[in-house]
Amino acid sequence: LYELINQFLDELQYMEQRFDTVKHEQEEDSFYSIVLPYAEHIDALIADLKTYQNVITQKVNYFNESKFSLLISNLQDLSVECHFARTSRKLFNEKLKAVRYDLNQIKRNGECND
């Protein structure tokens, strides 16, 4: 789980960089050649994360089922939104911050070091 969380944190960094590039250039990525494969990559990581759902919701303080679902939803949203210039910077950054906080909370408090 620890490695998976680190992988998600790396992906968040990529999403943030991709979003900044797309916003700066005002040129959106191709949906079928870039966005869809990347979203599928993130979905595969999410499927791995879901196998740890019970461990996370039981071991991490204040991390219940609804917070876990919101984390998943935000990860899915960010994986697509980072490729589009029309995405609101404020909303994107709020989701990014929330996801980064949640992942770090799992990493710190989860006692899940494989």
Where are these regions (language model features)?
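Short, well-ordered alpha-helical segments
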Residues: 63-74
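Short, solvent-exposed, charged loop/turn and helix-capping segments
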Residues: 45-64
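Short, flexible helix-adjacent loops and helix caps
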Residues: 20-27, 54-58, 80-87, 111
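A loop-to-helix transmembrane entry motif
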Residues: 30-40
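Short terminal alpha-helical segments
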Residues: 1-32, 96, 103
